[in-house]
Curated annotation (Swiss-Prot):
Record keywords: Cytoplasm, Lyase, Nucleus
InterPro entries: ChaC, GGCT-like
GO molecular function: gamma-glutamylcyclotransferase activity; glutathione specific gamma-glutamylcyclotransferase activity
Gene source species: Saccharomyces cerevisiae (strain ATCC 204508 / S288c)
Location relative to the cell: Cytoplasm; Nucleus
Protein name: Glutathione-specific gamma-glutamylcyclotransferase
Keyword Isomerase: no
EC number: 4.3.2.7
Additional note from the record: Present with 1300 molecules/cell in log phase SD medium.
Effect on the protein upon substituting E115Q: Loss of catalytic activity against glutathione
BP terms from Gene Ontology: glutathione catabolic process
Record GO cellular component, one term: nucleus
C-alpha cells in the first residue's frame, strides 16, 4: 500500500487479483519486475488447515533465486527469458487498486487481517499498464509518478505482502507435481485450494499484457493448474 495526496494504492499478485479490496475506484494491470510468483507459501487460515496446510502464492525476489540452485532451476524451467541473468528477466503480472482517502484506513485494517500466516510488508516497484480512461480520471495521482526511461510506463513504488523464504510458512522449493498434489485436496475457511488457483489463472488470462516477445504468460501457473487437474 502506498499513499498519495488523494488515497492509497494496493498491489495484488495472488487472490487480490480476482478478490479485490472493497471501495476501490480503479483497477490497473501492472508488471512486477525482479520477482517470480510461486505457490510455495503454506496456508493454514484460508486455503488449508493447521493439520493439512494448502498452498498460496508468494513472490520470490531475484536475489534469493540466484543464490539458491533449486530456486534458479525451477524459475528457468518456466521462464521465457531463461537463463535468468538479470532482475528484468523476471516478469510477473499483478494489479493495483486505487482506494480513495475516505476508505484508506478501513482497507489497511482489512488487509492486515487478510494477509497473515507468514506474510510481511515489503516495497516493490511496478510498471503500470494505464489506458486513456485511467489517465483522464486519475490525472493528478498518476502525474506524480515518474515514467520508466525505456518502457515509458508510469512507475509506482508501493508496499505489498510477501511470504519471504525465511518465514515459517514458506515450503519451497517444490516441484509443480509436489505442489499440485497438495492443492488438489486442500480446503480451508476461505474455500478450496483449487478455487484459489483456478480463479487466479482465469483472471490473468483476461488481462493480456504485451511485451517485446508478445503476450506475457505465466507458464508456471499454467503448468500448475494442468497438473492439479490430473489429480482431482
Amino acid at each position: 500500500m502506498t499513499n498519495d495526496n488523494s488515497g492509497i494504492w494496493v498491489l495484488g499478485y495472488g487472490s487480490l487479483i480476482y478478490k479485490p479490496p472493497s471501495h476501490y475506484t480503479h483497477r490497473i494491470p501492472a508488471i512486477i519486475h525482479g520477482f517470480a510468483r510461486r505457490f510455495w507459501q503454506s496456508s493454514t487460515d484460508h486455503r488449508g488447515t493447521p493439520a493439512n496446510p494448502g498452498r498460496v502464492a508468494t513472490l520470490i525476489p531475484y536475489e534469493d533465486i540466484i543464490r539458491q540452485t533449486a530456486f534458479l532451476k525451477n524459475v528457468n524451467l518456466y521462464s521465457e527469458s531463461a537463463p535468468i541473468q538479470d532482475p528484468d528477466d523476471l516478469v510477473t503480472i499483478g494489479v493495483v487498486y486505487y482506494i480513495p482517502p475516505e476508505h484508506a484506513q478501513e482497507v489497511r485494517e482489512y488487509l492486515n487481517v487478510r494477509e497473515q500466516n507468514g506474510y510481511t510488508l515489503h516495497e516493490v516497484e511496478v510498471h503500470l499498464e494505464t489506458n486513456r480512461e485511467h489517465e483522464a480520471e486519475l490525472g493528478e495521482a498518476l502525474e506524480q509518478l515518474p515514467r520508466h526511461n525505456k518502457s515509458g510506463k508510469r512507475v509506482l513504488l508501493t508496499s505489498v505482502y510477501i511470504g519471504t523464504i525465511d518465514n515459517e510458512a514458506f515450503v519451497g522449493p517444490e516441484t509443480v507435481d509436489e505442489t499440485a498434489k497438495v492443492i488438489a485436496v486442500s480446503h480451508g475457511p476461505s474455500g478450496s485450494n483449487y478455487e484459489y488457483l483456478a480463479k487466479l489463472e482465469q483472471a490473468l488470462a483476461q488481462m493480456p499484457i504485451m511485451k517485446e516477445r508478445g503476450r506475457i504468460t505465466d507458464h508456471y501457473l499454467t503448468a500448475l493448474l494442468e497438473t492439479v487437474n490430473k489429480y482431482r
